[in-house]
UniProtKB/Swiss-Prot annotation:
EC main group: transferase
Top-level taxonomy: Eukaryota, Fungi, Dikarya, Ascomycota, Taphrinomycotina
Presequence boundaries: 1-30
PROSITE patterns xrefs: RNA_POL_PHAGE_1, RNA_POL_PHAGE_2
Chemical reaction(s) catalysed: RNA(n) + a ribonucleoside 5'-triphosphate = RNA(n+1) + diphosphate
EC numbers for this chain: 2.7.7.6
Name recorded for this polypeptide: DNA-directed RNA polymerase, mitochondrial
Compositional bias per record (Basic and acidic residues), positions renumbered to this chain: 223-240
Database matches in Pfam families: RNA_pol, RPOL_N
Chain intervals for the UniProt region annotation (Disordered): 221-243
SMART domains: RPOL_N
Length: 1154
């Protein structure tokens, strides 16, 4: 079979076909209201020499050499970067993608400040001539800016006139040069207009707004008493923010740094899209948020220093058992080691006789992008955060740590670049920006021009996401981790058994070791147990990265696939995890303006303001300080009674059992410490944000599901986090609000399958327990602790007690989010897709006086099967027939629609059977096997049409993944290259990422690691694609439904938050939200989704041929129709027949979400 190297090449000026063999962009919409983005077909090119292909420019991803070029440019190493640039030019002459690289090179020379204009001009001319290209408007803008430099003014003004003359001679427009707001300030624009005698009236008012030309700019005056970025009111004394009394220096130092904004004159550029006007507090909080993001890393080091000095002042000269002080001792040594490493890198770069393949020449330019201070602080913060993640309670893989460290350095570098770019933005005038916000037409035009400008300035001027190659990330991370391991020491104490005294010894805080996982030897970094104890001891965590925290202001609205959320960190709208194809689709959909509604919806989720529930926080502090285990809160110390070593035993098995038990207890203890550290993180964040209003920026997974970008404390987390969080904006309960609070509390006790009246009565009957819980949460009956979600229940008890005792509950201001959950939401979508009336009734799409319980319905069918088998003499059926409850089948029913495998379902049922009285442990596996088959059989009988749709989706996926474009087959390319791609109703393109990526061996300072090469040319995994497609498709539907509901609520000024298929709002707005979410569901499914999907597949994969082996049909029939051909035209099977369900019935179903 002919094998070819497939080089993906995305042309900016030509339409090419996609990797899946598809035309990339449609010239017309498939449908009237949504636009599927199609894929690229590979640009087939003969394999070039090993050196040559390194320098082929590829827009779809950045090669290691391209990233190295950028790193050298940003480091000011213009000699090496020019050498690399010339190499690119030699292999890509005439290709316009060279222009952004040339522009970046010119821009960095200019922005360094010290340059000769003649050198800049000659450099630009030389590079452009070698590349056989003409400069674009950005090239001319940069050169014009250089000519305006005060040190070059005598020579510069004639050059300016010549540049503009040349640009006009090439039929260019001056406005195209001036519109590069990242290059010119308004004053520079005005100076150019004056020099060229361009009348103001040549520009439209909208263009003048975007150029930054205001009346004050024209007159040349600045308003007295006002800051350039806003009015004098910003300078006025702001009200003090109430602080929380605490031992930690972390918050005090942070608040100290923030308070400087009250008294000092600080220029804070105002973001062109994000700032809401009319509230001084918003402006102040924006300043605090930006300061937090910009300076928190180095502020952490200051906190560590403060704590360390405090310990020394107390006269304790030993190694201190205090997190901050310990970190500072590491930080000081680590910073020095980074300085020495950077010095070695600089020396090596000057020594031309050394081996050019030396690793320092490869990773050095990247390491130098950050200061040694930041490198040291980030290294400690990143390793500490991973160490406290419960997933790594037995240690973290070296590859995970190296990747995390390297990516954290890259993110910080991107953050610095964003801060730098902000200084050059033209939207610095708050008054002018306010005019844009007050004129919707001008604002829309401004956003459009910004989008065009971003495209015009190109990706090299704005470093892309994950642009550092994986090999570089690993090498940089390895350097940092090796340096940390050499300095990270911790003091441990032990009792001297001979003297009874205390022994102290300094040991490594982290150990590099190896463990076996699935038969493979894996490098691990294991923290010392004393380090875990230290982290979990106090509420003191000065190592939280600002990019992991909630925000003090409304997050930056999403305006493109790569621009939104935090202000000084860049993350994509969709969490890509190296899925390059998803980037391709997402980027083009964003550029085409097709994601505007999705941007609006994700931004709306971020606009919801939150606060900490102070009453619940106080309860948690009491529990935490007690050090005892309570519900899900881990204890301070885990007591593990280790049996004595059987040294006198003659049975070797006794010693094996003892060692096994020892490992189990050690793992238990380490896991408990890790969980306490994780809980400590959450509590620390809550403490820091007491008395604050804050927000959660959101992003999506590849299926479109929304998640907060913030880590640890957010509403998608556990019961404790959800209980701690409430809406910062309160609303009166109104006539029905108290009843909804009662329904909410009953749901938290697991009484969610009763009618609303019964749920309300449950709370009324236990009202004295509610009062007792609110008054004496830890000293009373603790009735709240018996709830399924106890901490949320306690928060609800506080709210209900206060509302009832207020005397006027309708006027009581409520902050608690009321949760309305779908009934096995995946099955709801399947029932609507298939028009399944019986299925619809089971999942509350059909109106009823009481909610249906699908889990009980399945359990009843299973019991019927078992009774029948028992009557036939089956022993297992006879034992199980009276023991199968809804709780036994619930996990399998919930996950069946999301693709749970038989093995996964059997494990779920095994765990339930183990708790049944009389069940012998040795028989669990056999009984679980038997029962799993019966549950699957029951589900198929109850949801026939849902399974028919699942089968159709899997069959289509199987055909797609075994298909290729006809021209590929002719050329002998028969690899399985085609993934499944579809488009949601909100125009989000979804590409399934399951491919057979090859591993690449990377040698680092610490050890050899293996990383996946995320390559578009990797073959797909047909089985994984097929099994994952049905659940992924349903996930994309429930995400679309959530966003449609979000948009409707936003239009009605209703606070809306969501955890997938659980929708939250104020108690007074529950009825209205329920009405809107029903309308959104009907609207979604009125679009004939399955027919649309089939049409999209037929258009997307038009002209494809599929392997005959992939088609489940009679061989004789295929042979008669196609002869002996191995590949035949791709045809999709007909859709399953749809039932007679009237979707409008959903509008009448009050238990649809409840």
């Amino acid at each position: 079979m002919l094998r070819r190297k497939i080089q993906t090449y995305l042309s900016r000026s030509h339409i090419r076909r996609g990797l899946c063999g598809l035309r990339f962009f449609q010239t017309q919409r498939l449908h009237t209201d949504y636009m599927p983005i199609e894929a690229y077909e590979p640009y087939k090119n003969e394999l070039k020499s090993k050196i040559g292909k390194d320098f082929i420019i590829d827009l779809s991803y950045k090669s290691g050499t391209a990233s190295l070029f950028e790193a050298c440019v940003y480091n000011g190493d213009f000699l090496r970067s020019k050498q690399l640039l010339k190499s690119f030019i030699d292999h890509n002459k005439g290709d316009k993608i060279l222009l952004p690289m040339i522009n970046l090179y010119i821009r960095e020379i200019i922005q360094r400040g010290s340059f000769e204009l003649t050198d800049v001009l000659s450099n630009a001319k030389e590079l452009l001539q070698q590349a056989r290209l003409n400069g674009d408007s950005l090239t001319y803008a940069l050169l014009c800016q250089a000519s305006l430099n005060p040190t070059q003014r005598q020579l510069g003004l004639p050059v300016l006139h010549e540049l503009i003359h040349n640009w006009r001679s090439a039929n260019g427009k001056v406005i195209d040069i001036l519109m590069h707001e990242s290059v010119f300030s308004p004053e520079e624009v005005k100076l150019i207009m004056d020099q060229l005698n361009i009348p103001i009236n040549n520009f439209t008012p909208s263009q003048l707004q975007l150029l930054g030309i205001t009346n004050s700019t024209i007159v040349g005056e600045s308003e007295n008493g006002k800051d350039q970025n806003g009015d004098s009111s910003l300078k006025e004394k702001q009200p003090d923010v109430e602080t929380t009394v605490t031992k930690s220096a972390n918050l005090n130092a942070l608040r100290s740094s923030l308070s400087s904004l009250l008294t000092e004159s600080i220029d804070l550029p105002i973001d062109e899209v994000s700032l809401e006007f009319g509230n001084q507090g918003d402006t102040f909080n924006l300043a605090r948020q930006k300061l937090l993001e910009k300076s928190a890393i180095l502020s952490a080091a200051e906190v560590w220093k403060s704590e360390h000095e405090s310990v020394l002042n107390r006269g304790n000269l030993q190694v201190p058992k205090n997190v901050s002080s310990l970190f500072y001792s590491w930080y000081v040594q680590l910073e020095q080691l980074f300085k020495e490493e950077i010095s070695l890198i600089d020396d090596l770069a000057l020594n031309e006789s050394l081996d050019k393949k030396n690793d320092r020449l490869i990773y050095g330019p990247f390491l130098k992008l950050l200061s040694s201070k930041k490198l040291a602080a980030l290294t400690i913060m990143e390793v500490a955060q991973l160490s406290t993640n419960p997933r790594y309670d037995r240690g973290a893989r070296v590859t995970t740590l190296l990747g995390g460290l390297g990516r954290s350095f890259e993110r910080e570098f991107l953050s610095e670049q964003i801060q730098r770019q902000e200084k050059n933005k033209s939207y610095k005038d708050k008054k002018r920006l306010k005019e844009l916000f007050n004129d919707p037409r001008k604002f829309r035009q401004a956003v459009k021009n910004l989008r065009l400008s971003n495209t015009r300035d190109n990706i090299v001027l704005n470093p892309s996401v994950d642009s550092w190659p994986s090999a570089i990330v690993m090498k940089v991370g390895s350097v940092a981790l090796c340096l940390l391991l050499s300095v990270a020491k911790i003091e441990v104490t032990a009792k001297d058994l001979s003297t009874g005294g205390i022994l102290k010894q300094e040991v490594a805080a982290f150990v590099h070791t190896y463990q076996y996982s699935n038969g493979r030897k894996v490098g691990m970094i294991v923290p010392h147990v004393e380090f875990y104890k230290l982290l979990s001891r106090d509420i003191e965590k000065p190592h939280l990265h600002p990019q992991l925290l909630p925000m003090l202001v409304t997050p930056k609205p999403w305006t493109s696939w790569i621009d939104g959320g935090y202000y000084y960190s860049r993350q994509p709208l969709v969490r890509l995890k190296g899925a390059l194809e998803q980037v391709d689709y997402l980027m083009k959909a964003s550029e085409n303006g097709q994601l505007d509604e999705l941007f609006k919806a994700v931004s709306s989720l971020g606009k919801v303001s939150w606060r900490i529930n102070q009453r619940l926080f106080n309860v948690l502090i009491r529990i935490w300080n007690s050090g005892e285990k309570f519900l899900s809160i881990p204890p301070r110390e885990v007591k593990c009674d280790m049996p004595p070593y059987p040294k006198n035993s003659i049975n070797p098995r006794d010693k094996v059992i003892w060692h096994t038990r020892r490992k189990e207890l050690a793992a238990l203890k380490t896991g408990a410490h890790s969980q306490r550290c994780d809980f400590n993180y959450k509590l620390e964040i809550a403490r820091a944000f007491l008395n604050e209003k804050f927000y959660f920026p959101h992003s999506l997974d590849f299926r479109g599901r929304a998640y907060p970008l913030s880590s640890h404390l957010h509403h998608v987390s556990n019961d404790v986090c959800r209980g701690l969080l409430e809406f910062s904006t309160g609303k009166p309960l109104g006539p029905k609000g108290l009843n909804w609070l009662k329904v909410h509390l009953a749901n938290l006790f697991g009484i969610s399958k009763k009618d609303f009246a019964t749920r309300q009565a449950f709370v009324d009957d236990n009202m004295q327990e509610v009062f007792d819980s609110a008054d004496r949460p830890l000293d009373g009956n603790k009735w709240w602790s018996k709830a399924d979600d106890p901490f949320q229940a306690l928060a609800a008890c506080f709210e209900i007690a206060e509302a009832v005792r207020s005397g006027d509950h309708e006027s009581y201001i409520s902050h608690i989010p009321i949760q309305q959950d779908g009934t096995c939401n995946g099955l709801q979508h399947y029932a609507a897709l298939g028009g399944d009336i019986e299925g619809a009734k089971q999942v509350n799409l059909w109106p009823s006086d009481h909610p249906s319980d699908v889990y009980e319905a399945v359990a009843e069918i299973v019991r019927g099967f078992l009774k029948k088998d028992a009557e036939a003499g089956d022993e297992m059926a006879n034992f199980l027939k009276d023991k199968v409850t809804r709780s036994v089948v619930k996990p399998t029913v919930m996950t069946n629609v999301y693709g749970v495998t038989y093995v996964g379902a059997r494990k779920q049922i095994s765990e339930k059977l183990e708790n049944i009285d009389g069940m012998e442990k040795l028989k669990v596996a056999d009984y679980a096997n038997y029962l799993t088959k019966k549950v699957f059989e029951a589900l198929r009988s109850l949801f026939t049409q849902a399974h028919e749709i699942q089968d159709w989706l899997s069959a289509c996926c199987n055909l797609i993944t075994h298909s290729l474009p006809a021209d590929y087959i002719k050329e002998g390319i028969k690899d399985e290259l085609t993934p499944v791609v579809w488009t949601t109703l909100l125009n989000l393109p979804i590409v399934q990422p399951y491919r057979n990526y090859k591993s690449r061996q990377i040698r680092t300072n610490l050890q050899t690691v293996f990383i996946e090469e995320r390559d578009r040319t990797a073959t797909v995994q047909p089985h994984k694609q097929a099994t994952a497609f049905p659940p992924n498709f349903i996930h994309s539907l429930d995400a679309t439904h959530m966003f449609m509901t979000c948009l409707k609520c936003s239009e009605q000024n209703i606070n809306f938050a969501a955890v997938h298929d659980s929708y939250w709002t104020h108690a007074c707005d529950v009825d209205q939200m329920n009405s809107l979410l029903r309308e959104a569901f009907v609207l979604l499914h009125s679009n004939n989704i399955m027919e649309r999907l089939k049409q999209e597949f037929e258009e997307r994969y038009k002209g494809f041929l599929v392997s005959k082996k992939a088609i489940k049909a009679n061989d004789e029939d295929l042979k008669a129709k196609f002869g002996n051909k191995s590949y035949i035209p791709l045809e999709f099977p007909p859709l399953p027949a749809r039932g007679a369900l009237d979707l409008k019935k959903v509008l009448e179903s009050k238990y649809f979400f409840s």
